[in-house]
Amino acid sequence: MPIAKPINQNTTVPYPPQHYSKPPLVIILTVILLVVFFIGFFAIYFCKCFYHTLTEAWNHHYHNGLPENQIQAQQEPVQPPVNPGLEPHIIQSYPLFPFSSVKDLREDKYGLECAICLLEFEEEHILLRLLTTCYHVFHQECIDQWLESNKTCPVCRRNLDPNAPENIKELIIEVIQENAHENRDQEQTSTSNEVMLSRQSSGNNERKIETLPDKFSRSKTTGHSIVRNKPEEEDRYTLRLPDHVKIKVTRRHNNNQTESCISFGELVRNREGRFGEVSGQSLVPESGS
C-alpha cells in the first residue's frame, strides 16, 4: 500500500476551466431599439427647431417695416358680414300682388317670368313681388330668399339698399321727374279736351286727329282716353305698367305706404276719377258705363 504524501500548503490546487456565455439576443435587440429611438427623437427635435427658426426669419423679412396692427390684421381671418342682405322690413316694403291683377297689363305675345327660377307666370293666384327700383318682378318666395343674402337685383344688379348714397340721389331725381311728368300729363289732358271739342264741332275731325304728332294715339274703343305710346320691349323679366300707375306705385313705396298686398285696380284710376283704358287694353270696367 503506497504511503500518502503530505500536501504542501503552498501548492495551488487547479480549478476546472470556466466557460463564458454570450449575452442573450433579447438584450442586444433592446439596446439597438433604444439607440434608434433616441437618434430619431433628437433628429425630429433638431428639425423642428430649425424649421421654427427658418419661419421666424422669413416672417421678419416679409413683414419688415409693416406696423404691428397691420400684421395682425393680415393674420386674422376675414369673416363675412353677419347680415349681407336687406333687412326684413325693407324686403316686405316692396309691393306684393297676385298675378291676376297685372295679367292684362301686358300683351299676350310677351311672356313674363321669374329670373330666379326661370318659370313663367301662369297661375293667377300666385303672389309676385315688384322691385320698384328697376320694375323687375319675381315670385315672392324666390326674391325674398334672394334678398336675405343679397342687396342687389338678380337681373340688373342694381343696389336696393335705400340707405346707399346712390339711391338717395336717384330718389331726388325721381321726384323731380315725377313732378315734370305730372305737368306734362296735365298739358296732354288739356290738349285731349281741345281735340274732343274740335271733333264735336267739325265734320272733318277724323282727318285732324290723324295728323296729330305720332306721340299721341286715340283709344280704340271709346275715343275719350289719349295716352302716349311707348316702344314695346321684349323684356320677360320687367313689368311694364302705365306711367301714372308706375308713379303711384313708386311713390307709395318711397313713402313706406305699401301694404302687404296692393290692388292695381285702385291705382289705374285716371285723373278725372274714372277708370279708362291704357294702350288699348281695358284694365277694369269703367264706372257708370
Swiss-Prot record:
SMART domains: RING
Chain intervals with Polar residues compositional bias: 188-204
Keyword Iron applies: no
Pathway(s) served: Protein modification; protein ubiquitination
Transmembrane regions: 26-46
Matching InterPro entries: RING-H2_zinc_finger (IPR053238), Znf_RING (IPR001841), Znf_RING/FYVE/PHD (IPR013083)
A Pfam family it matches: zf-RING_2
Presence of keyword Zinc: yes
GO BP annotation list: protein ubiquitination
Membrane topology of the entry: Single-pass membrane protein
GO cellular component, one term: membrane
Gene3D superfamilies for the chain: Zinc/RING finger domain, C3HC4 (zinc finger)
Zinc finger (RING-type): 114-157
Reactions catalysed: S-ubiquitinyl-[E2 ubiquitin-conjugating enzyme]-L-cysteine + [acceptor protein]-L-lysine = [E2 ubiquitin-conjugating enzyme]-L-cysteine + N(6)-ubiquitinyl-[acceptor protein]-L-lysine
The protein's Enzyme Commission number: 2.3.2.27
Subcellular location(s) per record: Membrane
Segments of this protein annotated with the region Disordered: 181-206
Keywords, alphabetical: Membrane, Metal-binding, Transferase, Transmembrane, Transmembrane helix, Ubl conjugation pathway, Zinc, Zinc-finger
CDD domains with a match to the protein in the record: RING-H2_EL5-like
Domain text: The RING-type zinc finger domain mediates binding to an E2 ubiquitin-conjugating enzyme.
PANTHER family hit by this protein: RING FINGER DOMAIN-CONTAINING (PTHR14155), RING-H2 FINGER PROTEIN ATL30 (PTHR14155:SF521)
Family: Belongs to the RING-type zinc finger family. ATL subfamily.
Protein name (database record): RING-H2 finger protein ATL30
Chain's gene name: ATL30
